[in-house]
């Protein structure tokens, strides 16, 4: 037996907020939405995937945002994305550079923490 890699990241969201998730993850972050399997659609939530990047947002009736645990997402042209996020009213917190990477944190519209990373050239 061998675990090879992470298949996807699951984040929780409140019920009935799929359009808000589509706006943030789809429009702002540019991750395309993919259809959920028919047998899972009744649960609510929405999935976004781009190649090996898979973020699944699932409805949690007792939703509480993940404020410390977070996925780290590699971004191309992070400075441009930071500008867009700030224009849209999101608070972006810059962190110390580590491993020659520019790193910031932002909360999605539900309060889930995301780390956005771009390797410095």
Residue ranges and their predicted role:
Residues 1-4, 88-121:
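Vicinal oxygen chelate
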Residues 1-22, 69-71:
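N-terminal beta-strand motif that seeds the catalytic metal site of vicinal oxygen chelate
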Residues 4-5, 63-68, 98:
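Short glycine-enriched loop/turn motifs at secondary-structure junctions
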Residues 11-54:
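Core segments of cupin and vicinal oxygen chelate
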Residues 33-35, 57, 91-94:
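A short linear hydrophobic-aromatic micro-motif
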Residues 40-44, 65, 98-102:
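Short acidic/glycine-enriched loop/turn segments that link adjacent beta-strands
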Residues 67-85:
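Mid-chain, well-packed structural core segment of small domains
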């Amino acid at each position: 037996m061998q675990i090879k890699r992470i298949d996807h990241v699951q984040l929780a969201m409140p019920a009935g907020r799929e359009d808000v998730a589509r706006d943030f993850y789809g429009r702002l972050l540019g991750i395309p939405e993919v259809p959920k399997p028919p047998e899972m659609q009744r649960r609510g939530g929405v999935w976004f995937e781009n190649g090996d990047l898979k973020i699944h947002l699932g409805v949690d009736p007792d939703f509480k945002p993940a404020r410390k645990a977070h996925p780290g997402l590699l971004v191309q042209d992070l400075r441009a994305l930071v500008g867009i996020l700030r224009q849209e009213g999101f608070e972006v917190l810059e962190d110390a550079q580590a491993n020659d990477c520019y790193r910031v944190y932002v909360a999605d519209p539900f309060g889930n923490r995301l780390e956005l990373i771009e390797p410095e050239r």
